[in-house]
């Protein structure tokens, strides 16, 4: 009886519930595309490692260290797992050659660096076979809607609706330390729509574009490095 009374006097609750379920489904949908351009043969031995470094030379953005760590951590999972040297550990050990202002931009710069005995020795100590340069960022666009919050004698509440689109775009360039050459590039682009409906309490429905970009890129990189 109580349920019927509620639905009789507040039929909009049912509509809102259906709308929220629909939005949850939409928010969980992220479109991710992967492009691979191979320029050389690849493969890796059990005693060899990969280091993933974020590009941070751009004036308007930096590749987030959290994304770099995410890709590296996922590459250590499952079948054909890759040994990953943590970015900060590598940069600290190689100081000052891999700081943002001094890091090699081209393979010929790496070739010049490898003539330094200390650089070559530390590469050998880490067992580095490949350096992966990650470059990119996640951008939020197409914001729309509005939410207003009020406080009154009966309490506080927020009402309204907002949405936005997130686009995560990253490139991974793979350098072979053995041959001092660029052996390929993998690009990922993930897009998704996020929503923020508010009926008394705001309920964020977030598209996990960066997490999806990380997962897909890590899987592709692992296959690429293994020569699959």
How should each PLM-predicted stretch be described?
Residues 1-6:
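Short, Lys/Arg-enriched N-terminal segments with co-localized hydrophobic residues
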Residues 8-18:
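Bacterial N-terminal signal peptides that target proteins for export
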Residues 29-48, 125-126, 138-143, 159-228:
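C-terminal/domain-edge helix-coil "capping" segments
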Residues 37-38, 112-119, 150-159:
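N-terminal post-signal-peptidase region of extra-cytosolic proteins
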Residues 48-54:
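Short hydrophobic beta-strand segments
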Residues 54, 58-140, 177-181, 185:
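N-terminal segment of the mature soluble domain
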Residues 99-108, 148-158:
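Flexible, solvent-exposed loop segments that connect beta-strands
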């Amino acid at each position: 009886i109580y349920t019927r009374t509620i639905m009789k006097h507040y039929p909009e609750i049912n509509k809102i519930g259906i709308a929220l379920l629909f939005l949850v489904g939409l928010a969980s949908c992220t479109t991710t595309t992967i492009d691979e351009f191979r320029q050389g043969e690849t493969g890796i031995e059990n005693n060899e490692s990969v280091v993933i470094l974020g590009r941070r030379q751009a004036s308007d953005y930096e590749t987030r260290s959290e994304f770099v760590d995410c890709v590296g951590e996922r590459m250590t999972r499952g079948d054909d797992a890759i040994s990953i040297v943590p970015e900060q550990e590598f940069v600290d050990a190689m100081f000052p050659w891999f700081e943002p202002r001094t890091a090699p931009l081209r393979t010929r710069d790496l070739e010049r660096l490898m003539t330094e005995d200390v650089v070559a020795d530390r590469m050998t100590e880490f067992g580095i076979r490949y350096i992966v340069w990650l470059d990119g960022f996640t951008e939020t666009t197409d914001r729309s809607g509005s939410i207003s919050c009020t406080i009154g004698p009966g309490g506080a509440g927020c009402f309204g609706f907002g949405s936005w689109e997130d686009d995560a775009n990253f490139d991974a360039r793979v350098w072979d330390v053995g041959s001092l050459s660029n052996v390929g590039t993998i690009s990922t682009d993930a897009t998704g729509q996020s929503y923020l409906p508010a009926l008394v309490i705001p309920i964020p429905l977030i598209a996990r574009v960066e997490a999806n970009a990380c997962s897909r890129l890590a899987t592709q990189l692992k296959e690429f490095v293994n020569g699959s």
